[in-house]
Amino acid sequence: MSKKRIIILGGGFAGINTAMQLERRLRRRSDIEITLISQENYLVFQPMLPEVISGNIGILDTVTPLRRLAPKTQIFIREVSAVDVANQTVSLAPAFEKAETHLKYDHLVVALGNVTDFRQIPGLHDHAFPFKNLQHALRLRDHLIRVLSEASITQDATLRQQLLTFVVGGGGFSGVEVCAELNDFVRDCAGRYFNLNPDEVRVILVHAGDRILNHEMPESLGIYAQKLLQKRGVEFIFNMLIKTATPDFAVLGDGQRIQTKTLVSSVPSSPNPLVLNIDVPLERGRIKSQLSMQVEGTNNIWALGDCALIPNPHGEGFCPPTAQFAIREAKTCATNILAVIDDRPLTDFAFTELGKMASLGHRRAIIRMFDKINLHGFIAWVIWRMAYWVKLPGFDRKIKVGISWFTDILCGRELVQTGMDLPAAVTESHFEPGEMVLEQGEPSARVSILREGKAEILKTRPDATPEVIGQLEAGDCLGIDEFLDDTSANYSIRCLEKMNIVSYQRKELAPLLTLPEIRQGMEKLRWPKEK
């Protein structure tokens, strides 16, 4: 008799906890096998991720290997390319193999979560730091150390202020916690750099609501958090959205431009694109599940976590996309999958939210418990730490985090970069009208192609007034002359219409110049064309 296969898509809280719950229930059974597919081989404990920025905990303390959590589960570290519901098949993108891998399932669990989606806001994908996983946290930390270092040595006052201005978009849990840790980190570290004063630092939080945590916490706790962060130097801009981002600005909905080299966006998120391509009922981009976690209209497909729309067991709306709900949903899902296999009745999900917590940095936090009790300050911070410490998966992780917290008190912060913020070989940039793309005399480290938009080319006359000497349109190259001649720009470029450019590092293209045919082709791209 062949084994029944349960395939779980996603290794977040919902996915890995479903696998763990199934393993516990299948200890004495050998007729069922569990397969989990994830793009990472670890679970990120996201509630503590902001502490990676400040260095309060070690780099790897927020992650736990999936195989340690679910040792009896077959794990594929692959990208899912397709799900064929009719043939009960999951297709995995190739890795070292040249062909796709196809896996048959008897039961499918969809726990893919959501993804950061910057597509609706021009420039955000190119110039904002998302904050969803460990890589994002490490990249942001490296960047913060780099801009502080550059600010301490630059002689350009405008650039210095730009480097020391930090903008965070979003006033929900993620945005507030990131803002609090970032503010603590940069102000504390600024005092350690020669020629930097912490008072020069600006940290600005932009939020669409009229106060932070306006949907997440009672008004009294939200106001407490707001006043506390203001006291620490954080500035707030309310009832405003970030409209677009460029290499030098965060542009707000009212047209205001904030000069900055650091924009962190905790919003927006959207359904995982794969979910939209699975042949199951959807609403608001999420899979419609019942209280049993069974997808409507199916008997062997289950959905839970952020990607699922599950009715609230108390009859008010839907279950929130939080870790505490995902963990309990996983328990119900595992129970009901085995109930279907064993021909037993299903169990409905029942859970009452225990509470909500937010860390505000510097040993302060806010807590809403059992929808009745409000706590704030140092006591709330102690409870916040203990609650999440207990929830950390794995005893070894608890030990490591405890040691990190203790050594942080004794030794302070480590300003060490991990190399996660290295410039990419190919980048995309967005510019707004009137913005300078290139300044005359500026050394250009990149060769760029104007993908869309329009720019004008300026040259400074002997009397120091600029003269327009030409225009660039979609398809034209920027910096090709300087690349071929190994010189700095003898002209400036200013954006006329909203433009997007694709840029390539000169050092990556340099080896191509040794090929005569390639160099001849590049010569034809010089500006002006008759040169």
Where are these regions (language model features)?
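Rossmann-like dinucleotide-binding core of oxidoreductases
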Residues: 159-217, 223-227, 235-237, 319-359
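FAD-binding core/adjacent interface of flavoenzyme oxidoreductases
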Residues: 2-3, 74-165
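C-terminal, flexible cofactor-proximal segment of oxidoreductases
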Residues: 325, 335-420, 521
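Beta1-alpha1 glycine-rich phosphate/pyrophosphate-binding loop at the start
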Residues: 1-82, 166, 176-216
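FAD-site-proximal beta/loop scaffold in flavoenzymes
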Residues: 127-156, 249, 257-326
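A Rossmann-like FAD-binding core segment of flavoenzymes
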Residues: 33, 75-90, 183-291, 295-297, ...
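Regulatory nucleotide-sensing modules
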Residues: 302, 415-482, 489-491, 527-528
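Cyclic-nucleotide recognition modules
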Residues: 362, 469-528
